[in-house]
C-alpha cells in the first residue's frame, strides 16, 4: 500500500471521529436543555398521557411549595402619628372687651384644621360687632343663647336685616359686608364658622380700621362727615363696641329704595324635623334646603346618655365639631394601624379629616349636644352599618373569617345612633 493510500485512510478516520464527537456534543446539549425541573417538564414533555402525568406532578409540587413557603408581607410603611384633633376653644384667651369677647381657633392654634376656622363670640346687651367683611372666607353662624340682629349687603344691592334666636343660623358669602348686634335682654353667645382654616377673625376688614387709614380730606369727601367729626372717630379698629339696644321692630334702612332680601341668609335649624334614632337625633342643613350656604353644611346632633354615633366617614369633606353641652369620646382611624381617642367637654372643638373613620361615644349622665360643620355644599356620609348591609353574607364570612351565624347578627340597615349599650 502506498503512502498516499495510507494518508487518505487516516484522514477519513479522523473525519469520522470528529463527526461522532459533534453528534455526542449535540446530544449532550439537548439533554442539558431537558433538565428535570418544573419549567422543563411543562415546556418540553409532549402532552401524551405520560406528559400529562408529569405535568400534574409538577403542579402538585408547586402547590406543595406554596403551602410550605411562608407568606411574604409587604414592608410596613412608616407613617407619621395622627395629629392632635382636639382644641379647647372656650378655654383660650382671645379678645376680651367691655361689651364682648371673641375666642378663635385657626391653623395657627390648631394645625390640623386646614379647612375651617371657628370663633366663639359673646356680646353683651347692645354690644355691636361692627360693620365689616371677610375677604377670603364665608361666615356661617349658629346661635346658642340670646338674640342677635344682623344687617348684610350683597354685591347686587340687595340688603337684609334679620333677627336670630337660639337654634337659628346665618350664612354670609365671602365679601358680603355685615354687622351683628345683641338685642338683649341677656348675653348672646354664638359660634362663627369660616370655610378657610387660615382665616383669622382678628384680621377682618372693619370699617373703623379703614376710615382711620384714609386722609381726613378723602374721608370727608366720601362720607359727608366734617373734618371736626372725623377727628373724633376711633383711631383704629373698634371691633366690638357698645351700642343702644335697638327697638324690637327693625328700623327701616336709610335708603328708602333699598332692595330688601327676604331672609335668604337665615335658617331656623331647630325648627327642622330631626332624624330620630334609638340613641338620639340629628338635624342636617345643607345647600339643598338652605340654598345660599354653598360652602358650609351644618348639623346639630343630640346624644342620649350611653348612646353611640356609629362608625362612619365623610367622603367629601372634613368635619369640625363644637361641643355645646355634655361630654363624649371620639375615636378616629387614619389607616396604617393608626387610631386615636379623645374625650370632649363643652367649649371644646374636634377636627376630623376628610375620609377618616370615626365614632362618637356619649359619656356621662347629661345628654350631649354637638354642633357639627363641614366645608362643603352637600352632606355625604358612609356608615359601617350601611356598608355591611350592602354586601353578600358569604363575602363577609370570608373577609372576617367568621360564621354565617355571626354575619346574621350584623346590622341589615343604617343604625346611625345606637341606644345605650345596644349591639345592633
Regions found by a protein language model. Give the residues of each.
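Glycine- and acidic-residue-biased ligand/ion/polar-headgroup-sensing regions
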Residues: 134-155, 314-335
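Ligand-binding loop in jelly-roll beta-barrel domains
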Residues: 166, 174-200, 354-380
Amino acid at each position: 500500500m502506498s503512502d498516499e493510500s495510507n494518508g487518505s485512510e487516516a484522514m477519513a478516520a479522523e473525519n469520522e471521529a470528529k463527526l461522532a464527537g459533534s453528534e455526542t456534543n449535540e446530544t449532550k446539549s439537548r439533554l442539558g436543555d431537558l433538565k428535570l425541573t418544573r419549567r422543563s417538564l411543562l415546556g418540553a414533555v409532549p402532552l401524551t398521557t405520560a406528559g400529562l402525568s408529569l405535568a400534574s406532578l409538577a403542579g402538585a409540587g408547586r402547590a406543595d411549595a406554596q403551602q410550605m413557603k411562608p407568606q411574604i408581607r409587604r414592608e410596613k410603611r412608616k407613617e407619621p402619628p395622627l395629629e392632635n384633633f382636639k382644641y379647647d376653644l372656650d378655654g383660650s384667651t382671645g379678645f376680651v372687651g367691655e361689651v364682648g369677647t371673641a375666642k378663635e381657633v385657626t391653623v395657627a392654634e390648631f394645625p390640623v384644621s386646614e379647612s375651617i376656622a371657628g370663633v366663639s363670640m359673646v356680646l353683651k346687651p347692645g354690644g355691636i360687632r361692627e360693620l365689616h367683611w371677610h375677604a377670603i372666607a364665608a361666615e356661617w353662624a349658629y346661635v346658642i343663647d340670646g338674640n342677635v340682629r344682623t344687617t348684610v349687603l350683597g354685591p347686587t344691592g340687595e340688603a337684609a336685616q334679620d333677627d336670630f334666636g337660639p337654634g337659628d343660623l346665618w350664612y354670609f358669602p365671602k365679601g358680603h359686608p355685615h354687622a351683628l348686634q345683641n338685642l338683649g335682654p341677656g348675653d348672646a353667645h354664638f359660634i362663627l364658622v369660616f370655610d378657610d382654616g387660615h382665616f383669622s377673625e382678628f384680621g377682618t376688614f372693619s370699617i373703623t380700621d379703614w376710615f382711620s387709614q384714609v386722609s381726613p380730606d378723602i374721608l370727608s369727601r366720601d362720607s359727608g362727615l366734617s373734618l371736626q367729626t372725623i377727628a373724633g372717630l376711633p383711631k383704629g379698629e373698634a371691633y366690638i363696641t357698645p351700642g343702644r339696644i335697638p327697638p324690637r321692630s327693625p328700623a327701616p334702612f336709610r335708603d328708602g329704595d333699598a332692595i330688601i332680601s327676604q331672609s335668604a341668609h337665615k335658617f331656623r335649624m331647630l325648627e327642622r324635623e330631626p332624624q330620630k334614632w334609638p340613641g338620639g337625633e340629628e338635624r342636617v342643613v345643607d345647600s339643598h334646603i338652605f340654598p345660599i350656604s354653598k360652602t358650609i353644611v351644618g348639623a346639630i346632633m343630640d346624644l342620649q346618655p350611653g348612646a353611640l354615633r356609629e362608625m362612619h366617614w365623610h367622603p367629601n369633606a372634613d368635619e369640625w365639631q363644637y361641643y355645646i353641652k355634655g361630654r363624649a369620646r371620639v375615636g378616629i382611624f387614619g389607616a396604617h394601624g393608626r387610631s386615636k381617642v379623645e374625650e370632649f367637654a363643652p367649649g371644646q372643638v374636634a377636627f376630623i379629616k376628610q375620609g377618616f373613620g370615626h365614632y362618637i361615644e356619649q359619656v356621662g349622665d347629661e345628654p350631649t349636644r354637638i354642633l357639627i360643620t363641614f366645608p362643603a355644599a352637600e352632606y355625604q356620609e358612609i356608615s359601617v352599618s350601611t356598608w355591611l348591609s350592602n354586601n353578600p353574607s358569604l363575602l363577609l364570612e370570608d373577609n372576617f373569617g367568621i360564621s354565617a351565624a355571626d354575619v346574621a347578627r350584623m346590622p341589615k340597615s343604617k343604625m346611625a345612633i345606637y341606644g345605650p349599650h345596644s349591639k345592633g
